[in-house]
Structures are given as C-alpha cells and as structure tokens.
C-alpha cells in the first residue's frame, strides 16, 4: 500500500462571498487534476434556485410595455435574472409582486412563500410613475447550471405566462493556480490555490463542500468496480494520528477510581481503544458499574478528545454533576460520595 503525505485544506476569507482555499501538499500532477475538476464542478453542478417564468397582469408577451412603468417587459425580465434566491422546496413555488407608484420596484417588494429567501432585496426591478401599477407572479424552481427560456416553456401553460432564462448556479467565478511546495527534501509537490466567488445565497465554503461531495459520489462509481483495488492512500491527519496513539493506551493511564478500573479489567477492557468501542449501555451491563462510573469514564475520554461509541458530540464535562472542570476534581459530598468512589466492587 502506498501512503501519501496527507494534504491540508485552509480557507482565507476575503469577503462575505469570496474565499481563497489552499490545498497542500499534493502529489505531483494532482494540483491540476483536482483544481480543474473542482472548478468545473463548482461552475456547473452546484444546486441553486432561480425564476423560471413570470406572469404580469395585462401582459400577453415580453415584447410589450406595462402602463405607468418606465421599463418595458423585456427589461423587467432582464432585471429579474439578477434576483438571488434560495429555496428549500423541491417543487416549483410562486412568489407575488404587487406595487403601486410612484417609486421604484425592488426585490424587497416581492412576497416569497415559506422556505424561499430573497438575498438581494435592494435590487431594482422597475420604476413606476404616479399612475403606475404592477402585479406579477414569479415561479421559482431549483436546478443546476443554466437553462434557456425555451426549455422552461411548459406545454399547456396559461396565456401570458412568460418563460425566463434561469441561471441556477450560485457560483459566480472560480480560478485556480498550482505552485510548487516542499515536503522535507522533495520540492516537486503541488500546492493548489483555489479562488471561489459566490452569490449571497451560499458561502464559498459550502459551495466547495458541495462540489467535493458530488465528485466523491461520481468517482465512487469507478471504485465500485473493485473495492479491494490498490491505490494511493493519504495518511492520517494529526488529530487522527493522536487518536490512533490514544487507542493503544492502557486504561491504567486514565487514572480511574478503583471501582471503575477493576470493573473494566474484570470485563476484559484493557486499552482505551477497547473502551471507546463500548456504548453506555454496554458499560452499565457490567456488575457494579453505575452511572457515576459512566460519568467518570466520559470525562476522562473527553480529556483525550475521545468519547464512548454512542456519546453525543455535544458532551460537556461542566454539566456533569459533582465534577469541577476548573480543578479537575470530583465533589466529596452528595451524589458523588468519596467512599462510594473509593470502594472496590464486591466480587
């Protein structure tokens, strides 16, 4: 098995909607392989939402005007293409726009349904004069990439329903470059620098995560041909390496109380790795191993950055009754009696 130097990924946030990501070190050639794949996926395959059709009261087609509105319908539709919207619904949803002049019509005048969010409410859509009035319905759908208006034209659509070009992609721009980087004595490793700019409906971080997930799913098809095929594997991260080292520690190093220690040894639990493979229920099945011992074990494992098999990630030692996180000691009164902790189990 060939084990490669594990790359790290860091993010430099430039603005709310632009970040620069650095992935290094990569095996020679993989900077361009990974950079090109991520760029194309980011630009074409990130799910988003967009307006797909519009109906304006009194308007039959886009080549006309609305009384009292400065812009013609074609310009109004062009402005609506700049609407940044996100939707949690998989089915098409309808938004409503009703405004009477004088004044500007902005995206903030649109009333979206639950599950739909407008991210640029200040965007100008049209301008009304004293007698101007506009009432419209906008259909929003989820999709990927770019879909021309002709493909959004539904068969049997009502008269006056105007299809719109839909730009679903929430990613505006992606560039990348590959520099050389050094690992020990080798200087031919790749350093991938990826610059991602998005719309306000998604962060660059989430967009990159989505692209990564898509590529993993697709490359998984090739892996399924032979799951035992040999390939380059990346080494563990520093945190994972620490965990691996911790798994080999004997439970003696946890400095448990006599009762907890003897109960675990009698059950055949000798290392931290064997301990973290157990659930709370497994431990409670051990004779004389009660909730007090469970709490003690969870606190000790938390100090190593580990937990029992079914412990929630949100475990907080400060919430454990009788434990003082400041001093790292247990209370000697009430529920956590020192005598109860000091005694050994009765065989």
From Swiss-Prot:
Homodimer. The RNAP catalytic core consists of 2 alpha, 1 beta, 1 beta' and 1 omega subunit. When a sigma factor is associated with the core the holoenzyme is formed, which can initiate transcription. Belongs to the RNA polymerase alpha chain family. The N-terminal domain is essential for RNAP assembly and basal transcription, whereas the C-terminal domain is involved in interaction with transcriptional regulators and with upstream promoter elements. DNA-dependent RNA polymerase catalyzes the transcription of DNA into RNA using the four ribonucleoside triphosphates as substrates. The lineage of its organism: Bacteria, Bacillati, Actinomycetota, Actinomycetes, Mycobacteriales. Residues 1-226 are annotated as: Alpha N-terminal domain (alpha-NTD). Residues 243-347 are annotated as: Alpha C-terminal domain (alpha-CTD). InterPro entries: DNA-dir_RNA_pol_insert, DNA-dir_RNA_pol_RpoA/D/Rpb3, DNA-dir_RpoA, RBP11-like, RNAP_asu_C, RNApol_insert_sf. One of its GO terms (cellular component) is DNA-directed RNA polymerase complex. SMART domains: RPOLD. This is DNA-directed RNA polymerase subunit alpha. The gene is rpoA. NCBIfam families: PRK05182.1-2 (NF003513), PRK05182.1-4 (NF003514), PRK05182.2-5 (NF003519), rpoA (TIGR02027). It catalyses: RNA(n) + a ribonucleoside 5'-triphosphate = RNA(n+1) + diphosphate. One of its GO terms (biological process) is DNA-templated transcription. Keywords: DNA-directed RNA polymerase, Nucleotidyltransferase, Transcription, Transferase. Residues 326-347 are annotated as: Disordered. Its EC number is 2.7.7.6.
